[in-house]
Amino acid sequence: MAAAVLRDSTSVPVTAEAKLMGFTQGCVTFEDVAIYFSQEEWGLLDEAQRLLYRDVMLENFALITALVCWHGMEDEETPEQSVSVEGVPQVRTPEASPSTQKIQSCDMCVPFLTDILHLTDLPGQELYLTGACAVFHQDQKHHSAEKPLESDMDKASFVQCCLFHESGMPFTSSEVGKDFLAPLGILQPQAIANYEKPNKISKCEEAFHVGISHYKWSQCRRESSHKHTFFHPRVCTGKRLYESSKCGKACCCECSLVQLQRVHPGERPYECSECGKSFSQTSHLNDHRRIHTGERPYVCGQCGKSFSQRATLIKHHRVHTGERPYECGECGKSFSQSSNLIEHCRIHTGERPYECDECGKAFGSKSTLVRHQRTHTGEKPYECGECGKLFRQSFSLVVHQRIHTTARPYECGQCGKSFSLKCGLIQHQLIHSGARPFECDECGKSFSQRTTLNKHHKVHTAERPYVCGECGKAFMFKSKLVRHQRTHTGERPFECSECGKFFRQSYTLVEHQKIHTGLRPYDCGQCGKSFIQKSSLIQHQVVHTGERPYECGKCGKSFTQHSGLILHRKSHTVERPRDSSKCGKPYSPRSNIV
């Protein structure tokens, strides 16, 4: 976009130039609150983020316009001179009723605002300005360069400057100040009180803030790092009466100081009356209020789904279009949102900017950090509507709900086995392929799953970080500690729906339920005998092989089952038989137990 070029159509009298210096000294500049992007950074922003950028820039511009335009102006007529802007049509002022302020076009504000709108790459939008800035419309029937207009204007009209509306949504009187003008409300009473005599203007482009301050701004324009150019009012000399204690900047009046302090970084002056949450921008507060009201004004034309924010609707549209405009330069993977691409790129760079204050663990995305922090706080915000069970993650709730529906949408194409999770199917398919891609660096043993490898690593380190608070017993895995703690509490959370029997572990319940179904899925390849449990099949197969893998360390006797070895070991530890005082026959303590 070419920058707007200023052309001085008449000379400015010396008195006006001197008056300008008195007017502009100490004012806040648009550059102080502007936000810039490089070409590369701008390319990473999606449409929703560009809309947010537009909103922020327009609100900041409305603030600066109020600070610069009318403060310090003299109560006298403006000298006749004009400033025009190339490419910006002259605008005829709509007729206004006597009870309302008359409207006049603003050749100072229009170039700024059209530049900001062009940045968002949203063609076909029309710009509406109220108050001193009047109406800027693309319709040529409103333009009349041959008939210069005459109108009265007072300083208070600058309070109503720079209200933006999208095409097809013209403003109403009730909307003035609703969005971008809210931060300017403090100026209106002072402006009205300090001024009675209106300024007389004879031409559309001769409003006092157009004829003087715009002419001065053209002398200090500055190109930003972005491809577009903005004009920045800047004054480096002059007396400054009010100084900000936060940033040290000075203003020519107290009202300007109040406005300057509102745009300091980190400040959130706009508070929600419902919950007390505060925001830095009024537009953010308006979006937040819809949480309380339940308003969802943005509706998807494809599926009818509604949203509280326009940016969310824009992102949702990509679900239907399948658009993925953001591509990773490293691996070529594409994403529908730029934020997802930024998080993905951290996989390649190894960057982990989000750190947990509790344990110091770092993460690549803020959402992952939030989920992790719930392990410290114990928060479980997701509740099952069927059984009331709580979960830390929404994904865990979705998986859990399949227990109630018995849904297993992921089916193996080779054996027909189905799974409730896609990852479960992927892991199962490795059984058919025989792939074991995860290998232990210590012993060379390989595994089909990374989680199994991680568990195996603890065998080499002998690390047992999970200690029972009741008995002090340590475990390698947290899941085993949880199961162990049920022996102390007596908790049996898994209930059989057939007979009502309870179990401490879920897999024990699964094995038990096979009794009711009669299912014996584990068949012996030698004799065809079937078993309910896989462990029972393994024990049975020893009968055919003759293997006795369990050997006593004291006497060398071997056994086919581990339980047989345990029973045998007790024969080495029990006391020698003693004679009965009644019958004289020897007995052992174990034989005395009924």
Swiss-Prot record:
Known CDD domains for this protein? KRAB_A-box
Q: Where are the zinc fingers (C2H2-type)?
A: 242-264, 270-292, 298-320, 326-348, 354-376, 382-404, 410-432, 438-460, 466-488, 494-516, 522-544, 550-572
Q: Where do the record's region annotations for Disordered lie?
A: 569-594
The UniProt entry, under PROSITE patterns, shows: KRAB, ZINC_FINGER_C2H2_1, ZINC_FINGER_C2H2_2
Q: Does Repeat count among this protein's keywords?
A: yes
Keywords assigned: DNA-binding, Metal-binding, Nucleus, Repeat, Transcription, Transcription regulation, Zinc, Zinc-finger
Which superkingdom? Eukaryota
One GO term (biological process)? regulation of transcription by RNA polymerase II
Q: Compositional bias of type Basic and acidic residues: which residue ranges?
A: 572-582
- Cite the GO molecular-function annotations of the record: DNA-binding transcription factor activity, RNA polymerase II-specific; RNA polymerase II cis-regulatory region sequence-specific DNA binding; zinc ion binding
Q: Where is the KRAB domain?
A: 28-111
Q: Which residues form a coiled coil?
A: none
Q: What does it do?
A: May be involved in transcriptional regulation.
Q: Could you say which protein family the record assigns here? A: Belongs to the krueppel C2H2-type zinc-finger protein family.
Protein's UniProt name:
Zinc finger protein 416
- The organism is Homo sapiens
Q: What is the lineage of its organism?
A: Eukaryota, Metazoa, Chordata, Craniata, Vertebrata
Name of the gene this protein is made from = ZNF416
